[in-house]
């Protein structure tokens, strides 16, 4: 998975003070999108173990952070969903008091009928 940036503190992409991960890749390409630069799946930079450590360091250091938001791009792009699911699972196990928001162009009804997405939804508080 690639991402464009990590924003913190972020007050605009969910309730409270958050960290927002702006992932690359979107098949929807909605008219009026605020982030068309994130549409190409290969844009941005690789999301690595160092990126995960940076994210965890922020959550460890700043207790006032309410949670993590995934935006983009589309975190549920078929090439992103595996990494996003693993990361959400890690965050929920390590930071159970933090909430996870995820913005996607897919509907809930479409997602729950597909096992790979339904599994990811187990770790997401707000879709």
Question: What are these regions, as identified by a protein language model?
Answer:
Residues 1-3, 17, 35-102, 106-117:
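Conserved Radical SAM active-site core
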Residues 2-29:
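N-terminal pre-triad scaffold of radical SAM enzymes
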Residues 125-126:
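Receiver (REC) domain switch/active-site residues of two-component response regulators
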């Amino acid at each position: 998975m690639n991402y464009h940036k990590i924003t913190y503190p972020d007050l605009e992409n969910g309730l409270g003070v958050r960290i927002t991960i702006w992932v690359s890749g979107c098949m929807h390409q909605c008219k009026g999108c605020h982030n068309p630069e994130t549409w190409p799946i290969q844009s941005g930079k690789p999301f690595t173990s160092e990126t995960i450590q940076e994210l965890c360091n922020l959550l460890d250091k700043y207790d006032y952070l309410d949670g993590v938001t995934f935006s983009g791009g589309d975190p549920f792009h078929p090439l992103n969903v595996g990494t996003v699911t693993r990361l959400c699972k890690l965050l929920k196990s390590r930071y159970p008091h933090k909430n996870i928001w995820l913005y996607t162009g897919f509907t809930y009804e479409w997602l729950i009928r597909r096992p790979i997405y339904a599994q990811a939804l187990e770790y997401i508080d707000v879709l």
